[in-house]
């Protein structure tokens, strides 16, 4: 599948004086699902270490289930697919899809305030995929374990109550713990297994440097960045010894803490590239070629490189941390890396006939509504057309609910349905 570039507005690359890059999932692409499986295994081990049941270790990472940009409901433990306006499109409790009635009972008008950070957490990044799957696994485990009583907002075990909010906090703490130690260490121990290497990368950056300035701004530490970038640019022994990776950049900034980097930022400190340690005090001298800095801000990048916001094209994978903040606060031109698009474009090509049929049915339904007079015949046609449009999992859920007492759709403290694993990413 060739790489595609989509544009929201025209961009004259000849006017770009400076190219900026994030590292993780931009210059450094991690191999999927091997990298996510590693993270997932380390998360399970960490949770067991802090007291979670050993039985959760039976779960293995399934790359077909999670997708990016799902929302975790910290109150009810549901994973939600939400559109840009806050409308709930799909929901899952563990591996069980929520019915229409269940979604309405949890979220009146099928709507949520996505910026309500007290209740909802948006799993924005590719780094969040193992975490997303873990939430489903934990809900699946505790819901099906006879030792725990299912409640609306968590699980009761004797005199102990574990809320979904505390479960969320435990997973978040585990993520922070493994990324500071275990995951980074395991990745560096076997770079070939977890990191993709593209021989075209040095060529690309070399050409960019011929026509402008190039900088790297990453949240990763220097030692990790140095190991990853050395691997990516060591295409051959001759090239590795002839040109170090730092020579491809005019400016290198690590530990940026984006999106904070695009606001007031942090103290700019220089990194000792031999030891990886930071020099004491704020760096106030002129920019030194191939030097590495820690912290700083986007304003300092512009000052050190002598460029303005509109002169910069910044390329990253995080729509919030990399793209929106740099665009809105600094006026940088931006390019979002979305690796999932390759997969989705493949599906688009494979399912072209089905998509055309859906478009035809949608147009047909609109025509019926436009000219309907309320006759029973037209209502039958409308219902038939709607059933044709429904996705398979929606039809199954609808049929299951038709066979149940309506009152059973309202989930009480002890009546949450047991999970039956589904594929959330493909359904979405």
Swiss-Prot record:
Residues engaged in binding Mg(2+): 22, 24, 317
Active site per UniProt: 22 (nucleophile), 24 (proton donor)
Family membership: Belongs to the 5'(3')-deoxyribonucleotidase family.
CDD domains: HAD_cN-II
Lineage of producing organism: Eukaryota, Metazoa, Chordata, Craniata, Vertebrata
Name used for this protein in its record: 5'-nucleotidase domain-containing protein 4
Superkingdom, taxonomy of origin: Eukaryota
NCBIfam families in UniProt: HAD-IG-Ncltidse
Pfam annotation, one family: 5_nucleotid
Keywords, ordered alphabetically: Hydrolase, Magnesium, Metal-binding
Entry's Gene Ontology molecular function annotations: 5'-nucleotidase activity; metal ion binding
Organism encoding this protein: Homo sapiens
């Amino acid at each position: 599948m060739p790489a595609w570039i989509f544009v929201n507005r025209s961009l004259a690359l000849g006017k770009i004086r400076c190219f900026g890059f994030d590292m993780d999932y931009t210059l450094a692409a991690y191999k999927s699902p091997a990298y996510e499986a590693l993270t997932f295994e380390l998360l399970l081990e960490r949770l067991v270490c802090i007291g979670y049941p050993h039985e959760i270790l039976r779960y293995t990472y399934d790359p077909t289930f999670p997708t990016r940009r799902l929302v975790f409901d910290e109150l009810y433990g549901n994973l939600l697919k939400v559109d840009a306006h806050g409308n709930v499109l799909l929901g899952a409790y563990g591996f069980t899809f929520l019915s229409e009635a269940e979604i309405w009972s949890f979220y009146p008008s099928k709507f949520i305030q996505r910026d309500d950070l007290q209740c909802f957490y948006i799993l924005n990044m590719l780094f969040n995929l193992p975490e997303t799957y873990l939430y489903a696994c934990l809900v699946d485990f505790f819901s099906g374990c006879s030792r725990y009583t299912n409640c609306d907002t968590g699980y009761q075990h004797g005199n102990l109550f574990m809320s979904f909010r505390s479960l969320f906090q435990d997973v978040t703490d585990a993520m922070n713990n493994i990324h500071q130690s275990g995951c980074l260490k395991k990745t560096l121990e076997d770079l070939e297994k977890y990191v993709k290497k593209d021989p075209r990368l040095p060529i690309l950056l070399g050409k960019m440097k011929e026509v402008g300035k190039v900088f790297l701004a990453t949240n990763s530490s220097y030692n990790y960045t140095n190991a990853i970038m050395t691997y990516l640019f060591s295409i051959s022994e001759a090239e590795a010894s002839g040109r170090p990776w730092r020579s491809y950049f005019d400016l290198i900034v690590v530990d940026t803490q984006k999106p904070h980097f695009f606001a007031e930022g942090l103290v700019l400190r220089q990194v000792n590239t031999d030891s990886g340690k930071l020099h004491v005090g704020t760096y106030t001298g002129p920019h030194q070629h191939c030097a590495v800095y820690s912290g700083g801000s986007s304003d300092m990048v512009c000052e050190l490189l002598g460029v303005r916001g509109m002169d910069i094209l910044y390329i990253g994978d995080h729509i919030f941390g990399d793209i929106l903040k740099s665009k809105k606060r600094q006026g940088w031109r931006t390019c979002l890396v979305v690796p999932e698009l390759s997969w989705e474009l493949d599906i688009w090509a494979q399912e072209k006939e089905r998509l055309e049929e859906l478009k035809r049915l949608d147009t047909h339904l609109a025509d019926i509504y436009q000219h309907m007079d309320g006759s029973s015949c037209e209502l039958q046609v409308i219902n038939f057309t709607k059933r044709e449009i429904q996705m398979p999992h929606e039809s199954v859920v609808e049929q299951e609910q038709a066979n149940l007492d309506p009152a059973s759709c309202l989930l009480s403290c002890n009546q949450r349905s047991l999970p039956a694993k589904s594929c959330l990413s493909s359904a979405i």
